[in-house]
Amino acid sequence: MKLLKSHPFLSLANSYVIDSPQPSNLNYAWNFGSLLALCLGIQIVTGVTLAMHYTPNIDLAFISVEHIMRDVNYGWMIRYLHANTASFFFLFVYLHIGRGLYYGSYKSPRALPWSIGVIILILMMATAFLGYVLPWGQMSLWGATVITNLLSAIPWIGKDLVEFIWGGFSVDNATLNRFFSLHYLLPFILAALAVMHLLALHEHGSSNPLGITANADRLYMHPYYTFKDLVTIFLFFLVLALFLFYAPNKLGHPDNYIPANPMQTPASIVPEWYLLPFYAILRSIPDKLGGVIAMFGSLLILLAMPLLDLSRVRGSAFRPLMKFFFWLLVVDFLILLWCGSQHVEEPFITLGQFATTFYFSWFLIIVPVVSVIENTLIDLATENKS
């Protein structure tokens, strides 16, 4: 124990992971940090291993993935572990953000860790998109073509920017090479941002379900919360193993097992399931530029939450009206996810437009208005009591 506190490096780990004082009333909604760190670790290790056998060439990429699956020892397991952990990574991130929205973890003095977290989410989406292109199946090629083409909506520089990203006049070998390079690099940037997220969080400590300062009653991180984290970690391993060994392609798209063919467009071009809500927002705006702005705006609006929430009460635990609207947002997000997976036809177009309208209304109208109503009711109750 003495070495843990005196060694220059071990003392850092001790203050952040072992002796870190945490509120005594944290529930399982605070376990996602450890799960996300574990997912990122798995992704980096499996990703580096896969990169040793992958060839970023349009003639060899699909074959090299099949080589990994068939000839590399446990290559099938490493690839499926990488693909399915990515799905759980996003699931945990969405739950982590949902917990932050519900319990008001974005409010001062924790606006900085919240902002870093939103940047992490955006980079994660970019990394996932780049990785989806690498197997060079039908979804890879056409997904890359559709998504990169969105940048052509930017006035004046759009067309030149798209050709700069492609490295030519279409998605080709240069595109695959640079996508592979960036997909390899970004997880390490994500790891650095995750450390910054932890450093910023350590400044004021974790929030808690009550939304009040917890200085009066705290517990050490170890053994109390490390063992609590292990419960959800083992549960995660169990569910991940079920997908890995029994349904490894359940969350993927079968068209990506067809080699990329620029002469044949798939019946429907859809991204991975975890990007579908934002894909639905993109599709719901008829104008190309408007759709791109809406898609990026749906992510960047999270950065404005510390300014939009005017309530004096942190979180929704003691705010019945806000609690009701929070669960409406959850339902709306699931509707967007479902709409994004469907063909671009009625009633999914109209439903997606309604869901998109509600999504932005929740942040820009509902949150500030409900905050003002609740503050007014608190003032009236205080005056009547006095």
Curated annotation (Swiss-Prot):
GO terms for molecular function: metal ion binding; ubiquinol-cytochrome-c reductase activity. Heme b b566 binds at H96, H197. Heme b b562 binds at H82, H183. A ubiquinone binds at H202. Binds 2 heme b groups non-covalently. Its cofactor is heme b. It is found in: Mitochondrion inner membrane. Keywords: Electron transport, Heme, Iron, Membrane, Metal-binding, Mitochondrion, Mitochondrion inner membrane, Respiratory chain, Transmembrane, Transmembrane helix, Transport, Ubiquinone. Pfam families: Cytochrom_B_C, Cytochrome_B. The keyword Endoplasmic reticulum does not apply. GO terms for cellular component: mitochondrial inner membrane; respiratory chain complex III. It is a multi-pass membrane protein. Gene3D superfamilies: Cytochrome Bc1 Complex, Chain C. The chain crosses the membrane at residues 32-52, 76-98, 113-133, 179-199, 225-245, 289-309, 321-341, 348-368. GO terms for biological process: mitochondrial electron transport, ubiquinol to cytochrome c. Component of the ubiquinol-cytochrome c reductase complex (complex III or cytochrome b-c1 complex) that is part of the mitochondrial respiratory chain. The b-c1 complex mediates electron transfer from ubiquinol to cytochrome c. Contributes to the generation of a proton gradient across the mitochondrial membrane that is then used for ATP synthesis. Belongs to the cytochrome b family. Heme 1 (or BL or b562) is low-potential and absorbs at about 562 nm, and heme 2 (or BH or b566) is high-potential and absorbs at about 566 nm. Fungal cytochrome b-c1 complex contains 10 subunits; 3 respiratory subunits, 2 core proteins and 5 low-molecular weight proteins. Cytochrome b-c1 complex is a homodimer. PANTHER family: CYTOCHROME B (PTHR19271:SF16). This is Cytochrome b. It comes from Rhizopus oryzae. The gene is cob.
